[in-house]
Structure formats: C-alpha cells, structure tokens
C-alpha cells in the first residue's frame, strides 16, 4: 500500500483515504470528516492547521481585493503635466476657500525661460519642504509662480483672421429688424476676439507647454477655455459659414485632422492633458458643412483617410459594444470610454475629493475613469451618467450606451459614404451606406421607446466587453434633451409618422422652456441638467424638426429658435457678453452650476445664434425685447 507523508510526520494514510479527503467538495467536510483511526490529538492538530490555512487564505484574498486595479487602457501624460498637478494641489491648499483659484489656470502654465523643468521642480521641493507640511503662504506661492512660469494663455497669441469682413456681402439679409441686425454684426465681430494662433515656442519646445502645437489658427471657446475644443468646433464652423469665413473654418478642420493623424483620434482639446480622451465625433460633419458651401474636393480627399482612422477608434476596443435583440440579431454600437483612471489633471483636487469616500483603489480608479468618460461625452456633468441620481459618486458613464454618440456615428457613416462618392469610390460609399443602415436599425430596436415617443439611453448589464441581450428595463426612462437627438438625421426626420410621434413627445416632455430646451428635468446642481440649456442641443433638435415636412415640427423648430435667440440677446444686453449656456427656465438669464464659474465668449453659442438667424431671420415688426 503506497503512503504519503503529511505535515504531521506520525500520520500515514492510504492512497484511497488521501483521495477521499482531498477530493471532498467542501473544506468543512475536510475539517470534520477525519478517518476514525486518527487519534484525537492528531485530529485537533489537523483542525487547527486547516483553520489557520483558511484564515490566511481569506485575509490574503481581502488584501488582494484592496490592491486590485482597473485594467482598462491608460494613456500616459507628460512630466510637465504631472508636476503642474503638484503646483495646483499646493495652490488650492494655500488659498482661502472663498478665494480658491481655477485649478485649470495652474495646469495651463508654461515654463519660463531659461529655467528647465528639473530646476523648477527642485525649487518647488525647497519651497514646500520649508512649509513643514503646512500650506505655503499665498504671497510666497504667487512669487514662485511669477518667477518660474509664464501665465496661463500666454502661449496662445491673438490672430487677426484673414477672411474677416465687418459686414460681409449679403450677411443675414433676412434679418429685417435693425436692432437684431446690429446685434448680429456684434456677434459676428466676436470671431476676432476668439481667433488665436499657437506661439512659435510651443512648436519649438513642446515639452515646456501643455498647449499642443497646431498648424493653423484656432477659434477658442473663450474665458478659461484657452485652447481649441473638438465638438465645440462644429457649431463654431456653422457660425463661420454664416460669417463667410471659409479659410478660418478650413483651418479648424486642418488642426483637428492633424490631431487624428498624430493620435488616431481627435482630442477633447489641444492640451497634453487631454490626450487620454476624445469628444463627440463631429469631424466628418465639419468637413461636410464646409464642402456643402465651398465644394472643396481637395479637403474631402484629405479628410477621408483620417475619418476612417477616427471611425475605427470609435468602433473598436472599449468603445465598441454589442447588444443582441430578441430575434438574436447583434447590433454593434458605441459608448464613451476614456483612457484614464486617475483624477483629471485640470480638476485633480475636485476629483480626489469626490472619490474620497471609496475604500479601495479599484473603486477609485473606476470612478475616475467614469468621470473622465463623462468629460469625453462633452456633457460633464449630468444625472444622465449616474446610477443613483443626483448622487455624484454613482457616476457610471462607461456603463451607458448613449443615444447621441450613436447619432454622431450614424452621421459619420453617412458623411463618409457621401465623401467617398464625391471622390469616386463607389464601393467604399456602398459599404458605409450599409453600415449606416445597420446602425439606424439599432435605433429602432435598442433605443426607441414607443410609449415615450423618444430614443432612450441603454444601460449595460455587464462590462460591455461581451455581447449582451437587450432588456427593456435597461432603458433609461428619465427625460433628457439627448432623447430627441436622432431627429437631427435626415433619414429619420423624413419619416412623417415618426416625426409626429416625436413632436407630441417633445411637447409633453416638460423640456420646452421659456428660453429654449432644457437639458434634463432634474435640477441636480450639475451644469448639464435643469435649469440649463446648451447651444448644441438647441441646434440639433431645431435643425432636425425644421428639415421635416411636418408643419407642426417646422413651427416648433422656429419657435424654439426664436426663444433661444431672444434670450441670448437679452443676456448680451444685460452683461455685454455671450455665455456658454443659458438658464432656459427664464428669459434673459445665463446658466450656472457645475465645477467652474459661468464662462463667456462664447464660440458655439455665437455659431448657433448666427446659424439660427440665417435660417429664420427676424421680421421688422417682431420685437426682440422682453
């Protein structure tokens, strides 16, 4: 009989007994089913051995769970960004709460010559060590920043647009009201204030800046946003088309295409700390808008390979999700998914405070990824991304398959099909027409809710890495402006019966307010919720309704556009500026909420005002005053 030695040298058991013990289905069976010939003392020894073994295993597994990390993709940032985060932390700790500076103003600093990063880091180490873990005095910190850094925005220089004319020929000829016309000229003139170029020092010494080099001049949004932003640029270009500034518009597209060429996708914004995420994919729509006016085939030919590159980014890897419908058909859709699982450099203190309630590294990393992903959506922040709104810590953006993202990608498929046809590639065009039809089918199956008359975001049951079966209860039945985004697509707004349902739903939704369309019905304190309204959503819904052949839809579109124009006018007359967002529950009030102060300028707001005035004009008899 073959025997095996165990931990107790005095214990011998047969092969049969050994197998019976160690193939037992439960460790408790093992502990309490000792062979009868084993003495009591030996049974006790074995019991304590297995007891301590189980305790050790449990403790080890708990420690492992505390040290588990998020395995998703992370794009590394630069040494300068990492260092500026330290400066930002020190600054926000030094200032009194009521005087807290904008954290982004520190991450946008550039190194002053002749100092190197290592020299400044060494000086900063000395500065903070002298404070003995106490806040650095504000005066001392300000002196340090002034000595070693050039101010935020100093590496972005004013640029006079070559194609700006103060009163272009035929400009807004259908705006008959002279008061409105004069205001429209002032809005048109704001392009000069927002036109900039990246300084030569950024091209020559990129490692001294967080601003990225770009080949052409830019139109920035304004205020704290001292760089070009991806999805903002679409509505800026809509306005530039009205202003007949075609060279400037092409320059914006050229800049974004250069980012796609370098990174494989258009960045959230042209900063080193934005390389970990994109924004709503509207590059193809920008190219289409410009071609539609200029018939520039060379621009189309240059754009196609880069649009294919961007299309691949949004339809592969973590961005890609597959939803199987009741008939077993797999729908390939997309979600936002930032390549980052740490605090956002531009708001790192805010993000760290928000994550402070989580106990494990894995929870914090997932939360940070969901925050960065909300930023990739452009709608940062909103209850739309929260599992338990308005609890900010329940942010779960990567679990949402958003209606509007897939609208943008459907538009991209249609745009690429059109451009390939223009360039003579009929086979390529046919492929993208087929892709667009497949995605449009998903709008009917995955997003559409017949009872609501809206398209609803879909919440994933799992991580999204495997296909999952569609469930009705996974649709988010809360009302958001984005639920109506598909009406922007011509193949959808041409369906009269569908449009009538959507018009009824929008009318009864509670979203239509005195100054435009609410972003949501929830007043959460977040800026992409009630009572705010935003230019992009106004334009998409108004344009979609206006293109329909349904009379009620056209009338609704014009009514919303006039409300939006009027409120922007009243805010401008009151404050002297155009704002990033409006409080649409009242006429003539700008919006607030979120993690920064209200911003002015403002790129996409200007663009939508001009586009609406071009489309709808303003009769001489119609007053624009409150």
UniProtKB/Swiss-Prot annotation:
Keyword annotations of the record: Cell membrane, Cytoplasm, Glycosidase, Hydrolase, Membrane, Nucleus, Stress response, Transmembrane, Transmembrane helix
Active site: 380 (proton donor/acceptor), 580 (proton donor/acceptor)
Residues reported to bind alpha,alpha-trehalose: 224, 232, 268, 277, 279, 344, 346, 580, 595
Tissue distribution of the protein: Highly expressed in flowers. Expressed at low levels in leaves and stems. Expressed in guard cells.
SUPFAM superfamilies: Six-hairpin glycosidases (SSF48208)
Catalyzed reaction equations: alpha,alpha-trehalose + H2O = alpha-D-glucose + beta-D-glucose
TM helices/strands, residue ranges: 20-40, 45-65
Annotated GO biological process: trehalose catabolic process
Keyword Nucleus: yes
EC numbers on record: 3.2.1.28
GO CC entries: cytoplasm; nucleus; plasma membrane
Domain of life: Eukaryota
Disruption phenotype: No visible phenotype under normal growth conditions, but plants accumulate high levels of trehalose and starch. Elevated trehalose contents and drought-susceptible phenotype.
Class of the enzyme per the UniProt entry, highest EC level: hydrolase
GO MF annotation list: alpha,alpha-trehalase activity
Ranges in a coiled coil: none
Miscellaneous: Plants overexpressing TRE1 exhibit increased tolerance to drought stress.
Protein family according to the UniProt entry: Belongs to the glycosyl hydrolase 37 family.
Quaternary structure note: Forms homodimers.
Described function: Involved in the regulation of trehalose content by hydrolyzing trehalose to glucose. May play a role in the regulation of abscisic acid-induced stomatal closure in response to drought stress.
Protein name according to UniProt: Trehalase
The species this protein was found in: Arabidopsis thaliana (Mouse-ear cress)
């Amino acid at each position: 009989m073959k025997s095996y030695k165990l931990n107790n040298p005095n214990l011998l058991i047969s092969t049969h007994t050994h197998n019976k013990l160690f193939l037992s289905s439960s460790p408790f069976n093992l502990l309490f089913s000792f062979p009868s010939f084993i003495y009591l003392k030996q049974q006790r020894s074995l019991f304590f051995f297995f007891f301590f073994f189980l305790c050790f295993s449990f403790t080890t597994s708990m420690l492992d769970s505390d040290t588990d990390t998020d395995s998703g993709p992370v794009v590394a940032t630069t040494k300068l960004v990492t260092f500026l985060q330290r400066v930002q932390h020190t600054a926000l700790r030094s200032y009194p709460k009521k005087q807290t500076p904008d954290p982004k103003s520190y991450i946008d600093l550039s190194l002053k010559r002749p100092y190197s990063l290592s020299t400044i880091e060494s000086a900063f180490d000395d500065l903070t060590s002298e404070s003995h873990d106490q806040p650095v005095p504000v005066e001392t910190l300000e002196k340090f920043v002034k000595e070693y850094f050039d101010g935020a925005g100093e590496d972005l220089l004013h640029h006079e647009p070559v194609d700006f004319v103060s009163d272009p020929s035929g400009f807004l000829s259908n705006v008959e009201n002279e008061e409105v016309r004069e205001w429209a000229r002032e809005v048109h003139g704001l392009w000069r204030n927002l036109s900039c170029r990246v300084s030569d020092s950024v091209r020559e010494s990129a490692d001294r800046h967080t601003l990225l080099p770009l080949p052409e001049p830019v139109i920035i949004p304004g205020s704290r946003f001292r760089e070009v932003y991806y999805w903002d640029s679409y509505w800026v270009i809509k306005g530039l088309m009205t202003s007949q500034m075609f060279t400037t518009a092409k320059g914006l597209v050229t800049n974004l295409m250069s980012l796609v060429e370098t990174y494989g996708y258009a960045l959230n914004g042209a900063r080193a700390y934005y390389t970990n995420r994109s924004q709503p994919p509207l590059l193809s729509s920008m190219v289409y808008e410009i071609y539609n006016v200029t018939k520039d085939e060379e621009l189309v030919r240059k754009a196609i390979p880069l649009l294919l590159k961007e299309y691949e980014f949004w339809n592969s890897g973590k961005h890609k999700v597959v939803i199987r419908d009741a008939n077993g058909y797999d729908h390939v859709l997309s979600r936002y998914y930032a390549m980052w699982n740490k605090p956002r450099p531009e708001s790192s203190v805010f993000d760290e405070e928000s994550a402070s309630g989580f106990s494990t590294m894995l929870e914090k990393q997932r939360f940070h990824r969901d925050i960065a992903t909300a930023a990739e959506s452009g709608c940062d922040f909103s209850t739309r991304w929260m599992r338990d709104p308005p609890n900010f810590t329940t942010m779960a953006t990567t679990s949402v398959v958003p209606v509007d993202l897939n609208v943008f990608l459907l538009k991209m498929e249609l745009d690429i099909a059109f451009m390939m046809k223009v360039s003579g590639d009929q086979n390529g065009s046919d492929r993208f027409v087929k892709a667009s039809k497949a995605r449009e089918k998903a709008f009917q199956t995955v997003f559409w809710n017949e009872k609501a008359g809206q398209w609803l975001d879909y919440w994933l049951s799992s991580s999204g890495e495997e296909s999952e079966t569609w469930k009705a209860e996974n649709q988010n039945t809360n009302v958001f402006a984005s639920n109506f985004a598909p009406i922007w697509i011509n193949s959808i707004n041409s369906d009269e019966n569908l449009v009538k349902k959507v018009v009824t739903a929008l009318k009864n939704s509670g979203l239509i307010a005195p100054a435009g369309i609410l972003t949501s019905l929830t007043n959460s304190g977040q800026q992409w919720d009630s009572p705010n309204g935003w230019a992009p959503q106004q334009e998409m819904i108004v344009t979609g309704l206006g293109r329909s052949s349904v009379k009620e839809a056209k009338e609704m579109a014009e009514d919303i556009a006039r409300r939006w124009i009027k409120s922007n006018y009243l805010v401008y007359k009151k404050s002297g500026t155009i704002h990033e967002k409006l409080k649409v529950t009242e006429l003539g009030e700008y919006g607030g909420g979120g993690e920064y102060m209200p911003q002015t300028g403002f790129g996409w707001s200007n663009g939508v005002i001009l586009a609406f005035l071009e489309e709808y004009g303003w009769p001489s008899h119609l007053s624009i005053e409150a």
